[in-house]
Protein backbone atom coordinates (compact mmCIF):
# COMPACT_ATOMS: atom_id res chain seq x y z
CA UNK A 1 0.00 0.00 0.00
CA UNK A 2 1.33 3.43 -0.96
CA UNK A 3 2.12 6.11 1.61
CA UNK A 4 -0.78 8.26 0.40
CA UNK A 5 -3.21 5.35 0.80
CA UNK A 6 -2.01 4.82 4.39
CA UNK A 7 -3.43 8.26 5.28
CA UNK A 8 -6.94 7.00 4.52
CA UNK A 9 -6.82 3.96 6.80
CA UNK A 10 -9.33 4.09 9.65
CA UNK A 11 -12.90 5.06 10.43
CA UNK A 12 -14.22 8.47 9.42
CA UNK A 13 -17.50 10.05 10.54
CA UNK A 14 -19.37 12.48 8.30
CA UNK A 15 -19.14 16.03 9.61
CA UNK A 16 -20.74 17.95 6.73
CA UNK A 17 -22.12 17.38 3.23
CA UNK A 18 -22.55 20.42 1.00
CA UNK A 19 -23.66 20.49 -2.64
CA UNK A 20 -22.87 23.44 -4.86
CA UNK A 21 -25.43 23.76 -7.66
CA UNK A 22 -24.49 24.84 -11.20
CA UNK A 23 -25.73 28.38 -10.42
CA UNK A 24 -23.38 28.59 -7.39
CA UNK A 25 -26.08 28.19 -4.73
CA UNK A 26 -25.24 25.78 -1.92
CA UNK A 27 -27.55 23.21 -0.41
CA UNK A 28 -27.31 20.54 2.25
CA UNK A 29 -28.65 17.07 1.32
CA UNK A 30 -31.43 15.89 3.64
CA UNK A 31 -31.51 19.48 4.98
CA UNK A 32 -28.22 18.76 6.75
CA UNK A 33 -29.92 16.03 8.76
CA UNK A 34 -27.37 13.42 7.69
CA UNK A 35 -24.99 10.93 9.26
CA UNK A 36 -22.45 8.59 7.80
CA UNK A 37 -19.29 6.57 8.12
CA UNK A 38 -16.44 5.91 5.74
CA UNK A 39 -14.13 3.01 6.53
CA UNK A 40 -10.80 2.31 4.84
CA UNK A 41 -9.01 -0.95 5.67
CA UNK A 42 -5.28 -1.63 5.35
CA UNK A 43 -6.01 -4.54 2.99
CA UNK A 44 -7.26 -2.06 0.38
CA UNK A 45 -11.00 -2.27 1.04
CA UNK A 46 -13.47 0.49 1.85
CA UNK A 47 -17.10 0.97 2.82
CA UNK A 48 -19.25 4.11 2.76
CA UNK A 49 -22.64 4.62 4.36
CA UNK A 50 -24.63 7.86 4.34
CA UNK A 51 -28.14 8.27 5.67
CA UNK A 52 -30.79 10.79 6.47
CA UNK A 53 -31.33 10.83 10.23
CA UNK A 54 -34.74 10.11 11.77
CA UNK A 55 -36.15 8.12 8.86
CA UNK A 56 -39.55 6.49 9.37
CA UNK A 57 -39.42 2.92 10.64
CA UNK A 58 -40.24 0.21 8.11
CA UNK A 59 -42.17 -3.02 8.54
CA UNK A 60 -40.39 -6.16 9.76
CA UNK A 61 -43.29 -8.32 8.54
CA UNK A 62 -41.54 -10.68 6.11
CA UNK A 63 -44.80 -12.03 4.70
CA UNK A 64 -46.03 -8.54 3.86
CA UNK A 65 -42.67 -7.57 2.34
CA UNK A 66 -42.58 -10.77 0.26
CA UNK A 67 -46.13 -10.10 -0.97
CA UNK A 68 -45.25 -6.56 -2.04
CA UNK A 69 -42.05 -7.74 -3.71
CA UNK A 70 -43.95 -10.45 -5.61
CA UNK A 71 -46.62 -7.98 -6.74
CA UNK A 72 -44.08 -5.40 -7.92
CA UNK A 73 -41.98 -7.96 -9.80
CA UNK A 74 -44.82 -9.88 -11.45
CA UNK A 75 -47.76 -7.52 -11.91
CA UNK A 76 -46.92 -4.68 -14.29
CA UNK A 77 -50.16 -2.89 -13.48
CA UNK A 78 -50.01 -3.38 -9.73
CA UNK A 79 -52.26 -1.24 -7.57
CA UNK A 80 -51.34 -1.03 -3.92
CA UNK A 81 -53.76 0.29 -1.34
CA UNK A 82 -53.98 0.80 2.39
CA UNK A 83 -51.34 -0.93 4.48
CA UNK A 84 -49.46 -2.31 1.44
CA UNK A 85 -49.21 1.17 -0.08
CA UNK A 86 -48.07 2.67 3.23
CA UNK A 87 -45.43 -0.06 3.68
CA UNK A 88 -44.16 0.49 0.13
CA UNK A 89 -44.03 4.25 0.68
CA UNK A 90 -42.04 3.86 3.90
CA UNK A 91 -39.54 1.52 2.21
CA UNK A 92 -39.13 3.95 -0.69
CA UNK A 93 -38.50 6.88 1.66
CA UNK A 94 -36.06 4.83 3.76
CA UNK A 95 -34.09 3.80 0.67
CA UNK A 96 -34.24 7.30 -0.80
CA UNK A 97 -32.57 8.60 2.38
CA UNK A 98 -29.73 6.08 2.30
CA UNK A 99 -26.59 5.46 0.25
CA UNK A 100 -24.21 2.58 0.85
CA UNK A 101 -21.44 0.93 -1.11
CA UNK A 102 -18.23 -1.04 -0.61
CA UNK A 103 -15.27 -2.24 -2.62
CA UNK A 104 -11.56 -1.88 -3.11
CA UNK A 105 -9.82 1.49 -3.13
CA UNK A 106 -6.61 3.05 -4.31
CA UNK A 107 -5.36 6.64 -4.32
CA UNK A 108 -2.88 9.03 -5.82
CA UNK A 109 -1.84 12.53 -4.72
CA UNK A 110 -5.08 14.06 -6.03
CA UNK A 111 -7.85 11.44 -6.09
CA UNK A 112 -9.11 8.39 -4.26
CA UNK A 113 -10.80 5.72 -6.37
CA UNK A 114 -13.63 3.61 -4.95
CA UNK A 115 -13.97 0.47 -7.10
CA UNK A 116 -17.52 -0.58 -6.29
CA UNK A 117 -18.29 -4.26 -5.61
CA UNK A 118 -21.62 -3.88 -3.75
CA UNK A 119 -24.05 -0.97 -3.56
CA UNK A 120 -27.61 -0.01 -2.72
CA UNK A 121 -27.63 1.49 -6.22
CA UNK A 122 -27.25 -1.41 -8.68
CA UNK A 123 -25.88 0.81 -11.46
CA UNK A 124 -22.80 1.60 -9.32
CA UNK A 125 -21.65 -2.04 -9.09
CA UNK A 126 -18.60 -2.53 -11.29
CA UNK A 127 -17.91 1.20 -11.60
CA UNK A 128 -15.26 3.41 -10.06
CA UNK A 129 -16.21 6.53 -8.13
CA UNK A 130 -13.43 9.11 -8.26
CA UNK A 131 -13.19 11.58 -5.39
CA UNK A 132 -10.73 14.43 -5.06
CA UNK A 133 -9.20 14.32 -1.56
CA UNK A 134 -7.76 16.87 0.84
CA UNK A 135 -6.42 16.10 4.31
CA UNK A 136 -6.34 18.86 6.96
CA UNK A 137 -5.95 19.20 10.73
CA UNK A 138 -2.93 16.88 10.84
CA UNK A 139 -4.78 14.25 8.80
CA UNK A 140 -7.75 14.19 11.21
CA UNK A 141 -10.09 15.77 8.64
CA UNK A 142 -10.69 14.50 5.12
CA UNK A 143 -12.65 16.34 2.45
CA UNK A 144 -13.79 14.32 -0.54
CA UNK A 145 -15.28 16.13 -3.51
CA UNK A 146 -16.75 15.16 -6.85
CA UNK A 147 -18.50 16.92 -9.71
CA UNK A 148 -21.33 15.55 -11.83
CA UNK A 149 -23.61 17.40 -14.25
CA UNK A 150 -22.42 20.75 -12.86
CA UNK A 151 -23.19 19.80 -9.25
CA UNK A 152 -20.22 19.73 -6.87
CA UNK A 153 -20.41 17.58 -3.74
CA UNK A 154 -18.13 18.27 -0.78
CA UNK A 155 -18.12 15.75 2.07
CA UNK A 156 -16.09 16.53 5.17
CA UNK A 157 -15.12 13.54 7.31
CA UNK A 158 -13.54 13.54 10.78
CA UNK A 159 -11.32 10.67 11.89
CA UNK A 160 -12.93 8.67 14.71
Regions found by a protein language model. Give the residues of each.
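Lipid interaction determinants
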Residues: 1-160
